Amino acid sequence: MKKLIDLISEEVTKAFVEEGYDEKYGKATLSNRPDLCEYQCNGAMSAAKEYKCAPFMISDKIAARLSDNAMFSMVESVKPGFLNLKLNPEYLAGYLNDMQKEEGRFGCDKVANPKTIIIDYGGPNVAKPLHVGHLRSAVIGESVKRLGKYMGHNVIGDVHIGDWGLQMGLIITELKERKPELVYFDPDYEGEYPSEAPFTISELEEIYPTASGKSKENAAFKEAAMQATYELQQGRRGYKALLDHILNVSVTDLKRNYENLNVSFELWKGESDAQPYIPAMVQKMKDDGFAYISDGALVVDVKEDTDTKEIPPCMILKSDGASLYNTTDLATMVWRVQDYNPDMMIYLTDKRQELYFTQVFRCAKKTGIVREDVELKHIGFGTMNGKDGKPFKTRQGGVMRLEYLLDEINEEMLRKIKENQKEKDDLRMDEEEAEKTAKIIALSAVKYGDLSNQASKDYIFDIDRFTSFEGNTGPYILYTIVRIKSILAKYEARGNALPTPGTAILASGSESEKNLMLSLSKFNAAIENAFEETAPHKVCAYIYELSNALNAFYHGTKILTEEDPKKQQSYIALLMLTKGILETCIDLLGFSAPDRM
């Protein structure tokens, strides 16, 4: 189904062409003065230069040409040459009736040529709990993935676990000091290794920071950890068995935490999965003449003539022959191309890694790891800060675990729900329903609070504001959906059947009704735009506008007491379309709505 803005542009363009002007001047846009009109076209301003006449002379001709067009209720030429447009309510109602026939799609077509897209997001480290710094990658990545799937693409999410390097050696060395009798440390052991891990997740989460602290103060311990890392990378059986245990225990816990965020991954691959591909990749870079030795390290030049700042070479191996993140990320691309042949790869990390990804992407293209036509995209996000403007911390100043943050917001939402219940004697929730509802609303508060900000910008994580039922918040959006559910339930309780998707939505009879209809008509454009720009904040902006329009319509319209049955059915059909679109959008953002609040 064509976007409404495109249909309007087609009519305006036709008028420009019929008056002898170039079609490029007929593009319509949303009005930047909604008090004057709904859409506008400024093409006459640009056309005036080419046709050497006053812009208002052109806009007057276009307005006259469109004056009897059934699409518009108002076409106005305004000096110095603007074209102001208002849609005919009948035409707008017809567009919405076409939208509601496509249940679940609402006029948003899937792409004609689906792509295979891999999204690299999450990026947790094994043996470490998720902390608030992991929130943005998970939440933004999940939404981008859902948007891509909704548009019809084959989208694969890969968590890309940090499970390689010195951290593994540190854990192995600390474990060896504590439990030297374990068979994993016996180089002569040739039997089967135990299937049960020799540690729990809580023990593992304590082992790593202890070992990390020791390595900074004890040179011998650090040396032993580096040796253990080397032996692991060379394939020592016992250490590889320990790595498997570390991964299994960590991944089980990570999955639980991500599930609480309503985030899931198609692939649970790690840096260790890329290691087998490194030797052949490095050899090919050397053979093809791309990699050379510089200050002992193996590098590939990635600078380009058009660079306005210096782009250093991409380091492939350190002087001691050890691999780096660059090496692992490039080798990861090797297996992704081999296994999935993607058309696009999207990476979500802190925006401070922009230069790093410029180097890696250029190296991947230059050395032929990925085809030239594969799109490599880095979404760099800003920092989540506390009210003091500094990175979010616990009250004690430490890094806050993500599950503790979610618990804190769950408790705040539960408190608010119980407070609200005091005024609802006949409709009180029991404890179980209240807790379940609090979790649903809390997740909306966290996710919407993050996603409503442009990804690249830092933002203040304000629990009081994010958990408010008023303003641009997740709970406000959910409140709007629950309000619609409540009206529909009351309508049914009076013996009425909910209208089917084919029920006619009538032309608007009030300004608030038309504003709601105009907001609904923007759905397909909002979703397409949000995915094309990998910008979930645009979905948030859209549903905030739609929720405001719905609530204004609700306050200005006697929906349940309307005496004209056709008009009332039209109102209900309008509410059902709004509910469907809001529920689709929040699913794309990664949360859901309760039945009541």
Describe each model-derived feature in a short phrase:
Residues M1-A93, G104, C108-M597:
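Non-catalytic interaction-recognition regions
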Residues G94-M99:
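Short, charged, solvent-exposed linker or helix-capping segments at domain edges/interfaces
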